[in-house]
Regions:
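N-proximal low-complexity "stem/linker" segments adjacent to membrane-targeting elements
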Residues: 1-37
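Glycine-rich, basic loop-to-helix element that forms the pyrophosphate-binding segment
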Residues: 73-90
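Active-site donor/metal-binding and catalytic loop motifs
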Residues: 131-133, 194-197, 219-237, 245
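Conserved donor NDP-sugar-binding/catalytic core segment of glycosyltransferases
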Residues: 107-147
Length: 300
């Protein structure tokens, strides 16, 4: 049983362009930096809705004083409830999922909104592009470009001067935050699946649910950029076996889904086609063996 969640809406004078959902777990310095960057560097007016997990470091008091909508739990309830609960307070037609350890670059919102305006439907999943300070295995991130590994040593002026100078293509997959969905689609898939609490593999599961309701426009927008400090709050929590849960739920591994469906990290080429039947069959056979082995280990 999770800790009881309380809901605290704050009225706005006008309808926001985006409702930005940010779960935070005793990470006040990063949350301040994140929200201040949204306020400074956004072209449009947005609603920020925070889920405060515990908030014993002063987060709860700070959020109350910022005239923000927020939800609160006295214990950490993970990212699934941490996104689903603030989503109930969203006032915009567009929901943005964000971590609390981002610095949003200027006009991040404009570039996402322009992508949305180019479409004539709501069946999309569009996200910004992360800049990280250390080398990464992910081709969908701009790295390494070190502007500071913590908020305390963040070189904001250098970042603002250089962030837009790194050449990078739009990319397939859109599995990273900040991620924007139409509220109707978010409601249609039921948000994040809480059986993945505290949250490992909840994002790929959400992407699979989007695929199943017909979303085929998965785009990472290069010009919409955030700096990611990689403040790993997951190191403080007992993790669920998300990879195994995903395999048992969907009958395929995350890697198969990323490679065959989302084409994660490849140069963006438009709407994502269905997987190649022959290649997909081979990967599914491998995953079926993995799944049977996982079930056998569970029941042994």
């Amino acid at each position: 049983m999770i800790s009881k969640i309380s809901f605290h809406p704050h009225a706005l004078n006008e309808k926001p362009v985006f409702s930005i959902l940010i779960p935070s777990w005793n990470n006040l310095d990063y949350l301040k930096c994140c929200i201040e960057s949204i306020r400074k560097n956004s072209r449009y007016q947005h609603q920020v809705v925070v889920h405060v997990n515990e908030g014993k470091d002063g987060t709860l008091e700070w959020v109350k004083n910022q005239s923000l909508s927020y939800t609160h739990s006295e214990e950490n309830v993970g990212v699934c409830y941490g996104f689903n609960s603030p989503a109930t307070l969203a006032l915009s037609d567009y929901i943005v999922l964000s971590d609390d350890d981002y610095y949003f670059a200027p006009d991040w919102d404009h570039h996402l909104l322009e992508e949305i305006k180019n479409l004539d439907h709501m069946y999309f999943c569009i996200c910004g592009t992360m800049i990280e300070h250390s080398p990464t295995l992910y081709s969908s991130m701009i790295a390494p470009h070190n502007f500071g590994k913590t908020v305390k040593d963040f070189d904001e002026q250098k970042f603002l001067k250089e962030f837009s100078s790194f050449p990078f293509d739009d990319w397939n997959g859109a599995n990273w935050y900040p991620l924007v969905l139409h509220k109707n689609i978010w409601n249609l898939i039921g948000g994040l699946s809480t059986e993945f609490t505290p949250g490992m593999a909840s994002d790929p599961d959400m992407m699979m649910k989007l695929w199943h309701v017909g979303v085929r426009y998965f785009k990472g927008v290069s010009q919409s950029r955030v700096y990611h400090f990689v403040s790993r709050s997951t190191a403080r929590v007992k993790k669920n076996d998300g990879n195994k849960q995903f395999l048992l739920k969907w009958g395929m591994s995350k890697s198969t889904f990323f490679d065959m469906h989302l084409r994660m990290g490849q140069k963006f080429m438009g709407y994502t086609p269905d997987p190649d039947r022959n290649s997909f069959r081979i990967k599914l056979l491998r995953d079926k063996i993995k799944r049977l082995f996982s079930v056998w280990k569970r029941d042994a």
